[in-house]
Amino acid sequence: MIDDDGYRPNVGIVICNRQGQVLWARRYGQHSWQFPQGGINPGETAEQAMYRELFEEVGLSKKDVRILASTRNWLRYKLPKRLVRWDTKPVCIGQKQKWFLLQLMCNDADINMQRSSTPEFDGWRWVSFWYPVRQVVSFKRDVYRRVMKEFAVTVMPMQEQAAQRQTPAYRRKRG
């Protein structure tokens, strides 16, 4: 499903743990990394597509996560000309995305990138919140920067709380 401007409706998923780190996934058989994402099927809402993609790409279900936020607006990126499939109609020149910030509510061991018969990813790791902005392919970088800036207001307090839990409390000596 491509809109009149040539953009494919899509959802992007940022999964964070209790420390405010985000799940960074390696594309199957490649050296490139990204957040899980995928197309919205006809008749499907963005939230329904997000849960479907979450299961297909990461092996998690609705009970394994909690929605913390979603982007206010659709965000777009254009594909480099070398990646556009000019022989298909309608021609898709890029993606327009609704992004979701999810908190992982289950164990890391429940993440299963191999649940689908055609996996999108073959590995993953937790990375610092801003790491993906510097590491994603260049044509997605502006969208990632905007997504992370919007989600930072939700994740930064989580990181501060995690740091406080890790900092030992010092008691004053009585003399």
From Swiss-Prot:
Any one Gene Ontology cellular component term annotated for this protein: cytoplasm
Extent of motif Nudix box: 38-59
Source superkingdom: Bacteria
Domain Nudix hydrolase span(s) in chain numbering: 6-149
Any GO molecular function: mRNA 5'-diphosphatase activity
PROSITE patterns tied to this protein: NUDIX, NUDIX_BOX
BP terms from Gene Ontology: mRNA catabolic process
Cofactor(s) named in the record: a divalent metal cation
Record HAMAP family: Nudix_RppH
Primary role: Accelerates the degradation of transcripts by removing pyrophosphate from the 5'-end of triphosphorylated RNA, leading to a more labile monophosphorylated state that can stimulate subsequent ribonuclease cleavage.
Homology family: Belongs to the Nudix hydrolase family. RppH subfamily.
Name this polypeptide is given: RNA pyrophosphohydrolase
Species for this entry: Serratia proteamaculans (strain 568)
